[in-house]
Amino acid sequence: MAETKPEIEMSEEERKIVKISSLKKKAINASNRFKNSFKKKGRRSSSRVMSVPIEDDIDAEDLQALDAFRQALILDELLPSKLDDLHMMLRFLRARKFDIEKAKQMWSDMIQWRKDFGADTIIEDFDFEEIDEVMKHYPQGYHGVDKEGRPVYIERLGQIDANKLLQVTTMDRYVKYHVKEFEKTFKVKFPSCSVAANKHIDQSTTILDVQGVGLKNFSKSARELLQRLCKIDNENYPETLNRMFIINAGSGFRLLWSTVKSFLDPKTTAKIHVLGNKYHSKLLEVIDASELPEFFGGACTCEDKGGCMRSDKGPWNDPEVLKIAINREAKCSPISEDEHKHVDQGRSTSGFESLERIKKKTDEDNVYEKQIATIDKSMDMAWLAKTQKAENFPISKGLECYVRKGAPKKGDGLLVGGVMAFVMGIVAMVRLSKDVPRKLTEAALYGNSVCYEESTKSKQNQGQFAAPVSSSEYMLMVKRMAELEDKCMFLDLKPAHVESEKEEKLQAALNRVQVLEQELTETKKALEEALVSQKEILAYIEKKKKKKKLFFGF
């Protein structure tokens, strides 16, 4: 019996060692697959359109963070093959400022939400039949691309009628429609824009038209809908906003914005440009006139498609571009383990270029290969003994993917839904503060710039900004606004006239006040007359005293 106990303890220890070894093996395999993430299966196609080089903007620092994040997800079994996308993981890292633990928690919550909501199959399963009626009460959608190839998203907030919107559909159905459109954007629109622009695109440019926005657009139902959309966007589709233009902003809006922006993250405010009614030149600097609707100062009308807001204009409508975009082989995604072994065993197989041909590449390609080899070496310090040298990365004949050296990082920011909810809140507060002095408004308008500084200047002044508004404070503000609205609605429901008895009492009280005021005036007048008489008597007495002194003095 004395010998069996140590044997049992030893077997438990061995099980722990085996478990740790298996986890470490997974991490090693993940690192190896990550290094080959820019390899693709070869394809045999004679189409000239299929050969499209797409430039990638992931730099060396991001690659190292991605490697660590990807290994952490694999060790926790949080990386299904359909979500094994480097750019998607990078967006979650940026949303949590490259904090791997926070990003992993956000990623885990996103996976659970997709299972519960059914986001993976919502494009096929959900049919939004009432879209025509919905667009009448909530005009929004994509129209064209900006000069850098990003899709342009437009919302005309002043034309939103939440009450009529919820008469033609339900809030749950509209939320499903919103998620479906987001899924289509990532599966169709962004890939199509990437093919058309020859570079990876996963962000959009947004235009919010706030002309005519008031309290009617910010009802209780509208706030509830926007809060749900904001929550979904921020938690499951982070970092999709590149820049936002808020146009037709009135003086009160800009005055309040100049105050509110000091409480926001500088990276967020750098993305938001608040413009008045002279916004056309600013939009045309970013968006070509042929891609901008006529009602925004552009040249596009989309008459044959029912107007710009219904046309869904963009490169995703080009059959050739769409064919490449929806083809999984046209994406830069990590290859499977079997493919990795196949590449290692036979580099000269169909679909891959031979090593001799790689060595004859241009000097620019050699720079990229050296950079990737350097990154591989830094990421494999833990297993340096097992790795002799970094592998060469063959480039596919079709859709070429490489890392651009020194690519700029994108800043953190809010999503369209979140910013839209915040904008609606600001507009509501502006409408409630109409008695702000005009001189104060003019001082804010002519003392500050309407279009705010770019990210380079905001970074220099980061120390001057206060801490951003937390979500709890924002929700508290929204709650108080809801309570205020309920009180206003309660007062509106009361009858405008007062009961006759109360009115008579009130009138009698007013008459009594008038009588008292009249009596007070008369009393005041009598008192003044008495004071005058008293002064005359005192003066007469003084005069008599002086005469008496003179008489006895002689």
Curated annotation (Swiss-Prot):
Subcellular localization: Golgi apparatus membrane; Cell membrane
Membrane topology: Peripheral membrane protein
Domain of life: Eukaryota
Coiled coil regions in record: 498-539
A Pfam family that the UniProt record links to this protein: CRAL_TRIO_N
Keyword set includes Transport: yes
Task of the protein: Required for transport of secretory proteins from the Golgi complex. Catalyzes the transfer of phosphatidylinositol and phosphatidylcholine between membranes in vitro. Plays a role in root hair tip elongation as a key regulator of polarized membrane trafficking. May promote the PtdIns(4,5)P2 synthesis and organization in root hair membrane.
Family: Belongs to the SFH family.
Protein name in the entry: Phosphatidylinositol/phosphatidylcholine transfer protein SFH1
The organism of origin for this protein: Arabidopsis thaliana (Mouse-ear cress)
